[in-house]
Amino acid sequence: MGILPDNTHTLACDACTSWGMAGVITFGGSFPEYPGLDGLFWQMTWSEWKKVYQTPYLIPGKVIINVAEFLAALITYETFAKFCSHKTTTLRIDSRVAQAWLDSCRCPKHPFDRCAQAVHLHMLKRSAKFRTSWVPSGDNSLADNFSRERFSANSNGHVVSGQRFRKVKPTWNNVIKFL
């Protein structure tokens, strides 16, 4: 038993070398702020990311998958931080390398190591703790769907895997602070 109680919400993220990256929060039960929804998701293509920040690691056609998975996790943490304050929240990820980097708050690819430190500091300020859970790619289908196909900002939400999700804008202020 940790100091912070477990969160009923679950996070998941994924990256795809050909299309982009995404993250999702699945609500554990009803959430009054978002009635009728099972969760929220963000997604971004590599072309869209290139407009945010140009890096030799993540450009369309030259994506290093472990770095991409790591970045997707950091953006997922930051985007859904308000749902994770004062709780321990599980992040499902299908990259063992990115999982190890997240667990150690370190990444051997500069400048993403600095990004990780900024996001972890942001989480500490929110009294949020994350634990990673590796899942086989086949069991990460929800995040996989969002990282491989464009979904619009439909206010009614999108039904994916029998659940209703609404698209939100990703937050990356702490992620890109050191880029």
Which residues does each PLM region occupy?
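A short acidic-Thr-Gly-centered motif at the start of a beta-strand
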Residues: 1-6, 82
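Flexible, low-complexity interdomain linkers flanking nucleic-acid-processing modules
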Residues: 146-179
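Two-metal-ion RNase H-like nuclease active-site motif
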Residues: 6-20
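Buried hydrophobic packing segments
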Residues: 72-77
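Short beta-strand scaffold segments in enzyme catalytic cores
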Residues: 21-25
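RNase H catalytic domain
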Residues: 78-150
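A short, polar/acidic, helix/strand-boundary loop motif
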Residues: 30-71, 97-107
